[in-house]
Every structure is written in C-alpha cells, then in structure tokens.
C-alpha cells in the first residue's frame, strides 16, 4: 500500500530508501491518480450475478426449503387423487358395459336374480339364436350375389377402359411418328433450297441421302394420316 503525504502544493509520495542505501526522490501525485495495485479487478456481469445472493434480503433458506416441501406434498396428493379418479371412472365404464341386471364384481359378472332358472326358460333364447343365424345366412347370401354382380360389372368396365387406353396410346404413337416425319420433310426442303441456290455450299453424302428418301417419307406420312383419321372416328 502506497503511503501519501500532503503539503501546500498537494499530495506526493515521500522519498524512500532503496535496499542499496540510495534514496528515491519524492514524487508528486496528480489529482485522481490511482496506482496500478489499487485498481479494482474487472469482473464480468455473469461473475457479479453469481456473487449476488440467490434469495431476496430477509428470506432465510429454511423458509424456502419448507415451501418447497409443501409444494412437493401437494403435488403428490394431487397425483394420488387423479389416479383414484381414473380408477373409479374405469370401474364405472366397465359396469356400464354389462347387460342390465348384471353386477360387476372382482370374481366376474353375477346376475341380479339369484333364483334358479327353469329348464323352459332357455327355449326362447335358443329360438332367438336360431332366427339370428338364419337372418345372418340370408344376408350373407345376398351380399355374395351382389358382390358377384359388382365384380362382373367392374371387370367389364376395366376391360372397356383398357381398350380405350390402348386406342389412345396407339393414336399417340401415330401422332409422334407424324411429327418426326414432318420434321424430316422440313429438313429436306431446307436442303433442296440450298441446292437451288447457285452459290450455296456443297452437300455431303448424308444430306443427299435425305433428299433421295423424300418420296418414301411423303408416302409414309400419307399412310399415317389415314390411320390417324380412322382412329379418331
């Protein structure tokens, strides 16, 4: 820690003696000067925030711990109540799914009437089952007949659709061939224009072969046009 002295001219550091016996001169100190060893160290905001107390002033950690324990007990109590409520709801749903007069117990379903059923009481139930089986068989036969007719109609529709699709594909193929051949005719006509010009370039072998095939290409175009017109009708 630096020792300062003050005189009429201001603050100064008095002369000090070195280890070898020599003396340092007194040094005048400017107003507001802070020595390097007295400059406070820099601390980031995160470090300053970490040094602050986590609890508000006047609040003890014991009170905070008790409040946490109380909240935890309340949460567990609510969880138990929710579990019990779900179990009761499931029991009610299971009881509502049983027929009238039947009670849901742990061992299974028990009828409300404990009297022994008479042998004649089973006959109406058997009669009802046989009538239900007959109606089910008749309905299955009707569905089978309807299914067979529906399958036949669907098969005929698919066959006709396949024929139409095949015809459309054939027409599309003919149209593509016509476009290619007409393009070749345009190229041949361009070559012929070059031949008619006196100062035009000489033609190579491939170009001459194209010109020779012009009649064959025109004939093929006529045949395809007839075929395309017949398919469109």
UniProtKB/Swiss-Prot annotation:
The keyword Magnesium does not apply. Residues 1-153 are annotated as: Disordered. Residues 62-97, 167-199 form a coiled coil. Residues 122-142 have a biased composition (Low complexity). SUPFAM superfamilies: Pym (Within the bgcn gene intron protein, WIBG), N-terminal domain. Pfam families: Mago-bind (PF09282). Disulfide bonds: none annotated. The keyword Manganese does not apply. Its main location: cytoplasm. It is found in: Cytoplasm; Nucleus. GO terms for cellular component: cytoplasm; exon-exon junction complex. Keywords: Coiled coil, Cytoplasm, Nucleus. Interacts (via N-terminus) with mago and tsu/Y14; the interaction is direct. Regulator of the exon junction complex (EJC), a multiprotein complex that associates immediately upstream of the exon-exon junction on mRNAs and serves as a positional landmarks for the intron exon structure of genes and directs post-transcriptional processes in the cytoplasm such as mRNA export, nonsense-mediated mRNA decay (NMD) or translation. This is Partner of Y14 and mago. It comes from Anopheles gambiae.
């Amino acid at each position: 820690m630096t020792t300062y002295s003050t005189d009429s001219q201001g603050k100064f550091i008095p002369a000090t003696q070195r280890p070898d016996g020599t003396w340092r001169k007194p040094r005048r100190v400017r107003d507001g000067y802070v020595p390097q060893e007295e400059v406070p160290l820099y601390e980031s905001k995160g470090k300053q925030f970490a040094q602050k107390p986590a609890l508000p002033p006047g609040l003890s950690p014991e009170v905070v711990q008790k409040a946490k324990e109380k909240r935890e007990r309340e949460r567990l109590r609510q969880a138990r109540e929710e579990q019990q409520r779900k179990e009761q709801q499931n029991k009610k749903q299971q009881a509502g799914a049983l027929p009238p007069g039947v009670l849901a117990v742990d061992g299974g379903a028990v009828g409300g009437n404990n009297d022994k059923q008479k042998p004649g009481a089973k006959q109406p139930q058997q009669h009802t089952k046989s009538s239900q089986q007959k109606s089910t068989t008749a309905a299955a036969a009707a569905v089978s007949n309807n299914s067979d007719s529906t399958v036949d109609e669907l098969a005929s529709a698919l066959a006709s659709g396949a024929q139409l699709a095949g015809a459309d594909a054939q027409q599309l193929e003919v149209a593509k061939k016509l476009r290619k051949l007409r393009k070749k005719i345009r190229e041949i006509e361009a070559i012929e224009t070059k031949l008619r010009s006196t100062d035009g370039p000489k033609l190579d072998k491939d170009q001459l072969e194209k010109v020779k095939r012009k009649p064959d290409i025109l004939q093929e175009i006529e045949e395809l046009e007839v075929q395309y017109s017949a398919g469109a009708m």
